[in-house]
Amino acid sequence: MESLNVDMLYIAVAIMIGLAAIGAAIGIGILGSKFLEGAARQPDLVPLLRTQFFVVMGLVDAIPMIAVGLGLYMLFAIS
């Protein structure tokens, strides 16, 4: 029975990390497309848009890193 619980933990961690990566990829893709759209409409605002783009991209990318950290903690500390 213990082996089944450990196997399910491995699957849960893999799903958590995978879904976090997929979500971040979709979010960064949408963010990049909106940045390019805004830069094409208002070329004089590119420096302001670029700063906001990188700040928000860092925030979007931080969530999967937290999920990876939690997943690895669950994988190595709990099992």
Curated annotation (Swiss-Prot):
InterPro entries: ATP_synth_csu_bac/chlpt (IPR005953), ATP_synth_F0_csu (IPR000454), ATP_synth_F0_csu_DDCD_BS (IPR020537), ATP_synth_F0_csu_sf (IPR038662), ATPase_proteolipid_c-like_dom (IPR002379), F/V-ATP_Csub_sf (IPR035921). GO terms for cellular component: plasma membrane; proton-transporting ATP synthase complex; proton-transporting two-sector ATPase complex, proton-transporting domain. Keywords: ATP synthesis, Cell membrane, CF(0), Hydrogen ion transport, Ion transport, Lipid-binding, Membrane, Transmembrane, Transmembrane helix, Transport. The chain crosses the membrane at residues 11-31, 53-73. Its main location: membrane. Belongs to the ATPase C chain family. The keyword Amino-acid biosynthesis does not apply. It is found in: Cell membrane. The keyword Transmembrane helix applies. One of its GO terms (molecular function) is proton-transporting ATP synthase activity, rotational mechanism. It comes from the Bacteria. Pfam families: ATP-synt_C. F(1)F(0) ATP synthase produces ATP from ADP in the presence of a proton or sodium gradient. F-type ATPases consist of two structural domains, F(1) containing the extramembraneous catalytic core and F(0) containing the membrane proton channel, linked together by a central stalk and a peripheral stalk. During catalysis, ATP synthesis in the catalytic domain of F(1) is coupled via a rotary mechanism of the central stalk subunits to proton translocation. This is ATP synthase subunit c. It is a multi-pass membrane protein. The record marks 61 as: Reversibly protonated during proton transport. F-type ATPases have 2 components, F(1) - the catalytic core - and F(0) - the membrane proton channel. F(1) has five subunits: alpha(3), beta(3), gamma(1), delta(1), epsilon(1). F(0) has three main subunits: a(1), b(2) and c(10-14). The alpha and beta chains form an alternating ring which encloses part of the gamma chain. F(1) is attached to F(0) by a central stalk formed by the gamma and epsilon chains, while a peripheral stalk is formed by the delta and b chains.
